Regions:
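Non-catalytic C-terminal accessory region of glycerolipid acyltransferases
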Residues: 2-33, 123-249
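Short, basic, glycine/proline-bearing loop/turn elements
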Residues: 40-42, 109-115, 142-146
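Catalytic core of membrane glycerolipid acyltransferases/transacylases, capturing the structured
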Residues: 46, 60-119, 127
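Conserved beta-strand scaffold positions in the cores of enzyme catalytic domains, especially
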Residues: 53, 90, 112-114, 170, ...
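Residue-level "edge-of-site" marker
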Residues: 57, 120, 176
Length: 249
């Protein structure tokens, strides 16, 4: 982001307000498809995979925020969708959004936002800002594509940029067990493994920003987000994982 932004993207921004409290709104209802899928997945994850959720009390009950989590595979979104008591608009890569003919209508019905990683995507960022200013939750995996070895990898700066542009907090989240559940599995059928997700305290970065945002600032905020995720995973992020890089998710 940054170079790919245009006036239509920035026009989404409303006058700056202080903190999530100014965005308070009634908790939004789950879209019907989202609710049915979430209920079914919840029974499976809690019963078969013994899903444990820690820190859910740290999640804002209303108002917009960005949920930033580590990323192993498709199960991560399912785990977060079950654990978070509000609907999440996830950023997804186009190839995931259109993986099969059934994927696009499914993703549209649950509110997913396709975003390109290899180039600036101001249209996607505009949609993200619209979702946030509607008081909703956006889910971003700062690492971008799936981790290939289950370890935390370097974060992209998209979550930091969106947080600064929208003036909303970032809630870090750490997901455990999904990599082991799908490692080496055919047909995407997970093996039985305990799953866990931990939520950290919301990180606030101040009021919405309209002007240019320095790359060094985006990278510093990305390092903080990745460090918080690493702390929840109880691992050291290392210089590669903590460093920021350009990208929308």
């Amino acid at each position: 982001m940054g170079p790919g932004e245009d006036s239509s993207t920035l026009s989404v921004l409303r006058p700056a307000t202080s903190g999530a409290a100014s965005h308070r709104a009634p908790v939004e209802a789950f879209p019907p498809v989202y609710r049915v899928f979430r209920d079914a997945a919840g029974v499976l994850l809690r019963g078969w995979f013994d899903l444990r959720v820690e820190g859910v009390e740290r999640l804002p009950l209303a108002g917009p925020f960005i949920l930033a989590a580590n990323h192993h595979n498709y199960l991560d979104g399912v785990v977060l969708g079950v654990a978070v008591p509000r609907p999440i608009a996830f950023l997804v890569m186009p190839r995931v959004f259109r993986a099969t003919p059934l994927h696009p209508p499914f993703h549209r019905r649950i509110g997913s936002i396709p975003v390109a990683l290899e180039r600036p995507d101001p249209g996607a960022i505009k949609r993200v800002l619209e979702v946030l200013h509607a008081g909703r939750v956006v889910g971003i995996f700062p690492e971008g594509p799936f981790s290939q070895d289950g370890r935390l990898v370097r974060g992209r700066s998209g979550a930091a940029m969106v947080a600064l542009r929208a003036g909303v907090p970032v809630v870090p989240a750490a997901i455990e067990g999904t990599y082991e559940a799908l490692r080496g599995r055919r047909f995407y059928l997970p093996r039985r493994r305990p799953l866990a997700v931990r939520f950290g305290e919301p990180i606030h970065f101040g009021r919405a920003r309209r002007g240019p945002i320095a790359r060094t600032e985006r990278e510093e905020i990305t390092r903080r987000i990745m460090s918080e995720i690493a702390a929840l995973l109880r691992v050291h992020p290392g210089p590669a994982a903590a460093a920021g890089r350009a990208g929308a998710s």
